[in-house]
């Protein structure tokens, strides 16, 4: 089904169904059935945007707004909604909603050039935000590193909106041929040698890329893993790479993994490091070798797809130091989207916790990572020693669930229950952009009893607030063993080998 048509039907369905039920519960967070105990002012983005859409749809002064976000090679994404006509007394309401929508699109889909049709006021306001001294200067500069272009806002007529051009990157779960799968993490690197779907070799090697400024350390480490795999293969037909960081056209544009490398060395040796290492294999075997480099979140979703063995869409979110995301379509394809869910606004509460790096509020990282646990724990009155690392603060809260002290145990249970409420109201928001039937939840935040409480509360919220979505989406927590073993093997399935 055409994506634009799907969204129109989706919004219409929700709008009509609310009136059939005689309920206004979806037209604003004031009527939410569930509120986080330690964050009662939480305003889910999905409900707030839906309330805006509903209010506008009842106005005689409504008009259609079309947003097109373009990235490299002309790939783009279209978003259509209703807004109030310019100058009808609702310009601030328009701006607040559309400013949030644009921020969401930047971090979900990715891109640098906005085409906006349907308003003259909004492009001008947004242009003020996305400049070197504007409110969104962080995004303005960040996306220059990602797409090698600053964020640009173009006002245009509807007929001037570029034609929809979606990217489809096929991924294979059959693993035919002789393949290398490589997974680059912050504390170890994993490699697998796979022949026609059978894993012949897997090795996990400790490394510390975040602490080394010499590009040769990283190059040597990658080649060491490649060469280990080659010893167990007669030839190499394809290489798939899973890496932390932002990947565009197989290049690693921004990555904390290589954060110590100088800007000059990064540009010369790191941005194309994986492609350059595969070129060395091509010289070794005197042949062209297909290669696909993907964000580790997308590969996590692919690993889930292989484990579930179903032709259905999968969204994966990893909850650790931050939040990571990955998506595989029901046709087993990557989309080329950014999927940086850590910086996607999911709470429209104007007093939501501020992220000091991006200078924005209400972003996913503060709701689905160890930072969320710490935030809620402090609000609940939990005391932490000053020298505790964030990871150890998380561990302290997780240990409280096992405590014999009933008060401590209840506080910890409420923290993970509150996070489950966050997720229950955010899944419909994710469904607005991603077509998925399975949500994989990973990471140390959801290990142990806390993770079970988190998932069960999210399911409860879905069932009672969004029953149609509850029927469609299943939530899974893969076990640690299958996740660790599967990541590099799944990466091996990235390139299409013919």
Q: What do the predicted segments below correspond to?
A:
Residues 25-161:
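Long, compositionally biased, glycine/small-hydrophobic-enriched stretches that function as flexible linkers
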Residues 100, 216-232, 277, 422, ...:
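Short, well-ordered amphipathic alpha-helical segments that serve as non-catalytic structural scaffolds
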Residues 108-120, 235-244, 434-445:
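Short glycine-rich phosphate-binding loop at a beta-alpha junction
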Residues 418-436, 494:
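Phosphate/ATP-binding catalytic cores across multiple sugar-kinase/actin-like superfamilies
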